[in-house]
Amino acid sequence: MVQLSELASALNQTESKGVFSKHPKGFGFVHPEDATDKTNDIYIGKNDTKFAMDGDKVTVKVTYPKTEKRGASGQITKINERAVVDTVGTYRSLSNRQVKALGYKGRIELYNDRISDTLYIKQPLSGVQEEDVVSLKITQYPTNTKTFEGKITGIIGHKGEVGLDILEVLCAMKIPQEFSSETLAEAEAFSEKLTDSDLQDREDYRNEITYTIDGDDSKDLDDAIHVKKLSNWHFELGVHIADVSHYVTEGSSLDEEAYSRATSVYVTDRVVPMLPVKLSNNLCSLNEAQERLTMSCLMEIDDKGKIVSYKISPSVIKTTYRMTYNNVNKMIHQGQEGHREALENFFKITDSIKVAVELHEILETMRKDRGMIEFDESEAKIILDEKGHPIEIVKRDRDTAERMIESFMLMANETVALDFQKKKLPSLYRVHDNPKEKSFAKLMEAAANAGFSLNSDSHQAINFFADEIKGTSSEKALTYQLRHTMSTAVYSEKNTKHFGLAATNYTHFTSPIRRYPDLIIHRLLHLYPSDHSNHTKDEWKERLPEIASHSSDMEHRAVVTERIIDAMKKAEYMSERIGEVYTGTITGLQKFGIFVALDNTVEGLIRVPNLHTGTTEELEFDEEASIFKGKKSETVYQIGQEIKIRVIAANKRKGTVDFEQIAPE
């Protein structure tokens, strides 16, 4: 007869397949294939990984099942598929003694410390020097009896070259740096002069006063606007977007490259474009006084922000002014320095800007009334010197001009999505799910503990809550938590709405120079008027899911890359400020410490031993409430709380900064 203990043991020894995420310290977690969230992840101890690396697909034997108090743990029994076959790192030569003892000429300090500590090289590539950054192909994975080996396939850069640190990250993240000769040849073959054939069947807006509004340094100008009042006192908003699809045709080398990249990547010292510069900064960029092919969305909007009518069509424009956010803000704000000069310099659009601001305010009110959830966000720009060293972090809040352009682009994106939806034509949508259930439940509890009402994740409830906490001592903490309950927006062939915008229909139409989904939208806008047969619709229904999935993945890769480089440069900046004192805001808590963000947007960690409360009492971590509290006193650390810190360490390579708390007096 089978004993209950034996049965339980047998049930515990179940196998599961999934993806291994490795921590730099060696342990990790397997995310099962059929799991929907991280609560089902299986912990793998350092000695139970079977030398699996980050991202490997593995089979795991569950040795301890999940309980109410702790997650499951197990042992990796098989590596089914390797995630990494090539990588990048820094070359280090070995001493003669080491060469003789180990049989290798050099080792590689890998960029990704989640793969493995050290990779050995039998024969370095000709020309490789100490501390060069190199690309590698893995030739042997580590086991109990085998060493981790690789072969150098190329030199990315030599020690001391400006920008090499950023280039290493781009290569590690597999962000392509060069275009193929075929792709470049296709781009160069286009004439700079528009022909009669190019202009055929296009609306002519060359006599319309149109202008672009972008950052001071922007070169890929893919959107222009015109705004005016009509005789019935309604507004006419024209959003004119570079017609990239005219040049990047389906099946071309340009198209294949654009699909592969799916997005431009914007990092501290450079832009890695989706398209060759001949297109991104020239033929498709709506440069001042240049005739450019566009796709236009003209909207008639009433004084409540409602669209009365619209027209979407291929077009041609001639940009009147290349405006910057700074100059437009000077035109808008009477008391701002340079206001009078800006009005004089850009006199042709003075009336249009006034009307644009009026329309923007109407649209903002309309979106707030329907429930759009908006957070005040600041951007930080890291200023580098000529050697690529960070010398300043400039924080910039979004002013009227920035919000106005965003408002108009949102309007165009919604209108184009509505057009596809009304005509029941296959398309791509930008969708955003409701808040994450578990995170939102924690927020509701935190709100209740602070004496505020948040009883659902409806737009009305969230906006009421946001207004209720405004100006209170809890605003920072609860707003930060609210922001982190939000899901990530993705691309989809299904129109499942956009929660954050409170929009029933939404797509990406306005940036085809830097986003592949927008290019697809333009392609479909060209296609459907002449061919909306069932065959064509069926073909696109089949193709769009893969385009959506790939575009979302590449967007995620770009975002992660940008964050890594941002963190690296901020750590480098703070490495010269060891010992300096700042006031920061607590942004997260874990049992090992507290994350703190400074006003300059640098984020660092105060480890528990460096939490100086001013007393000798011990702190305990309440995981459910996500707070640290004193065991005896009322000392509490929670998200949103201000805290005075001192910088004690910074690691550029890892992109980390360490703080210690300065004890309250």
From Swiss-Prot:
Protein location: Cytoplasm
RNB domain mapped to chain residues: 202-528
Transmembrane segments: none
Gene Ontology CC annotation, any one: cytosol
Keywords: Cytoplasm, Exonuclease, Hydrolase, Nuclease, RNA-binding
GO biological process: mRNA catabolic process
Superkingdom as given in the UniProt entry: Bacteria
Name of the molecule in the record: Ribonuclease R 2
HAMAP family with a match to the protein in the record: RNase_R
GO molecular function: exoribonuclease II activity; RNA binding
Broad class of enzyme this protein falls into: hydrolase
Catalytic activity: Exonucleolytic cleavage in the 3'- to 5'-direction to yield nucleoside 5'-phosphates
Recorded family membership: Belongs to the RNR ribonuclease family. RNase R subfamily.
Function statement: 3'-5' exoribonuclease that releases 5'-nucleoside monophosphates and is involved in maturation of structured RNAs.
Main location as per UniProt: cytoplasm
Record-annotated disulphide pairs: none
Pfam families: CSD2 (PF17876), OB_RNB (PF08206), RNB (PF00773), S1 (PF00575)
EC code: 3.1.13.1
Family matches, as InterPro entries: CSD, CSD2, NA-bd_OB-fold, RNase_B_OB_dom, RNase_II/R, RNase_II/R_CS, RNase_II/RNase_R, RNase_R
Boundaries of every S1 motif domain copy: 579-662
